Amino acid sequence: MTLDLNKLRFGSELIKRGFSAMTKGGVIMDVTTADQAKIAEAAGAVAVMALERVPADIRAAGGVARMADPMKIKEIMDAVSIPVMAKVRIGHISEAYVLEKIGVDMLDESEVLTPADPFFHLYKKNLTVPVVSGARNLPEAVRRIFEGAAMIRTKGEAGTGNIIEAVRHIRKVNEEISVLKRMSDEQLRAVASNISASYFVLREEASKDLMGVEGKLSYDSAYAGMGRSRIEREILAILRQIRRMGRLPVVNFAAGGVATPADGALMMELGADGVFVGSGIFKSPNPEKMARSIVEAVENYRDYDVVEKASEGLQGMPGVDIESIPKDMRLQERGW
C-alpha cells in the first residue's frame, strides 16, 4: 500500500499533532527570502517560517501587518526541502484557507501580525493543516488546544532580542501545570469555567446592546456552534489530560526574544520542546554562523562545552528593554 504523504501531514488531530511532534528538539527559523531559507536549511533548521518581514521590522514599521504575499511563500517553498510554515492573523479565517490552499506545512496564528478578529481565534479544527498558537500562561494554552492547535509556543516579546518574556511565559505554564496536578475534579471544573469565559464576551456585548444589561441572552452557539456546557466540558477534558500527563498534550516551543545560542539552551533547560527564532538570526551581523550556533546549542543544550563553543565569536541583534515598551504596544498582549 502506497503512503500518501499529504495525509501524513494534514487531516485528523492525531496526524496534525504527530507532524508537529516531528519538529521536537529542533529550531524553526523566520525567513523572508529563498536565500535565507537555504541558509536556515543548511544550518540544520527543522522548518522555516515564511514571512515578508521579521518581527523586529514589523515592530519598527508599525501599521497593519498581514499574511505574506503567497508568491513569496511559494518561492520559499520551492527553495527548500524542509517544512515551510506561514503566519496568519488571529481569527482571519480567509487568510488561513488561502495559506492552506498554497500547501504550507503549518500555520502560525500569530500575535506578531495585526489581529483580525477582536473576539475569537481561529477554530483550528476546521482546518486540515496543523496550527501553532502562542500562549503566555496555561489558560491561553488550553484555549488554543481546545480550538485545535497542534503546537503551543511561548509568545515572549517578538522582535526585541530580549528573552525575559519567553522565560516568564514558560515558567508560568510550568508552574500552573504543577498546581493543576494537585487539584481535585471539583477544582478543575472551576478552572474550566474560568478559562471558558472569554468565549462569551461577544454574547455578553450583544446582551448589553440589545437588552441593556449583560447575562440576558443564552450561551447557545457562542463559539463554533458550541454552547457553554460543551465548551466547558471539552476544556475540562483537556485539563484532566494535562493533570494526568503532567505537561501539555501537544509540543510546546519557545519563541519571542531568542537571540543567542545561550538563549536557545536556556529555553530548552526550562522545558521547551524546541525553539523558534525570529529576528535573532537575520538581524545579527553573521546570520549563517548564528543560525548554525543556535541549532548546535539547542540540540546539545545540556553540554555546556558545545554551548560555549557555539557562543564564541558571535554578536547578537540589538536588544530592546521590555520596560521601554508601553504595555499596549507589546505584541504579547494580542490574543484572548
From Swiss-Prot:
Name of the top EC class for this enzyme: lyase
EC number per UniProt: 4.3.3.6
Protein residues bound to D-ribose 5-phosphate: D30, G159, G257, G278, S279
InterPro entries found in the cross-reference section: Aldolase_TIM (IPR013785), PdxS/SNZ (IPR001852), PdxS/SNZ_N (IPR033755), RibuloseP-bd_barrel (IPR011060), Thiazole_synthase_ThiG (IPR033983)
Residues annotated for D-glyceraldehyde 3-phosphate binding in this entry: R171
Residue ranges of coiled coil: none
Reaction(s) catalysed by this chain's protein: aldehydo-D-ribose 5-phosphate + D-glyceraldehyde 3-phosphate + L-glutamine = pyridoxal 5'-phosphate + L-glutamate + phosphate + 3 H2O + H(+)
Matches recorded under Pfam families: SOR_SNZ, ThiG
Location of the active site: K87 (schiff-base intermediate with d-ribose 5-phosphate)
Subunit structure: In the presence of PdxT, forms a dodecamer of heterodimers.
HAMAP family given in the database record: PdxS
UniProt protein name: Pyridoxal 5'-phosphate synthase subunit PdxS
Organism: Thermoplasma acidophilum (strain ATCC 25905 / DSM 1728 / JCM 9062 / NBRC 15155 / AMRC-C165)
